[in-house]
Structure formats: structure tokens, C-alpha cells
Amino acid sequence: MERKPFETEQANVVQSLGISALPFYGLARGFLSGKYRPGVSVESVRAESVKEYQTDKGWKVLEALDHIAKAHGASLSSVALGWLRSNAAVSTPIASARTVEQLKEIMQVVVLTQEEVASLNAASL
């Protein structure tokens, strides 16, 4: 969700050096898992730091993720990680899990179409 610094400055450097990036907050501190929604209170140690994503842009991204996840029969987390993997400058997105269920969600592999990637990119700008 914090794409501008990477895409406007760092991605070109990474690619010119022939290396790749490892995004640390691949699920935007859990926001892209879909558990944070308007009007929903979430008990989490990350809840306060996730507030920065709870904006019109953030809700648009979740809406796009919802649509794509439904089409693939997949979790929002797996779609969000697939979105990161679609970026040529990213080798491996990093995501953490606290439960077995969360681990199962992030282990799903979702390959997105160009149209789906474009939809997510448009929502996040």
C-alpha cells in the first residue's frame, strides 16, 4: 500500500543492480488480510498502526481484493501476496501468521491476470 517510494525510486535501482526486493509488511501489517473493515473493532497489537491504511484508498484496495479473491476462491491475504509477486522487482513477499488458519491462507498461491493486477494498482493509487 505504500508503493510510491518503492516504485518511483527504489524499483529502478533494484532492477538495474539485478537484485530483487523483499517487502517486509507484505500484508500492510494485516490490513490486507481483510480483518479490518469500516465500523469493525479488531483486537490486535497492530490495530493502532493499521489506522494509517483505513482511508478511502485502503477501502478501495480491500474492495478490489474482495472481488478478485471471490473469483479465485481464495483468501484476501493470498491475493495480496500474489499482487506483490506480480511485481518483477519483488522476489518474495514476507508475511507472518499467528494461527494455523492464517498460515494456510498465506500459503495459497494465486496467480493474477494482468487485468487483476491493473485493478489493484488502480485502487492503490
Predicted feature locations:
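Beta/alpha (TIM)-barrel catalytic core signal, keyed to glycine-rich beta->alpha loops juxtaposed to Asp/Glu
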Residues: M1-L125
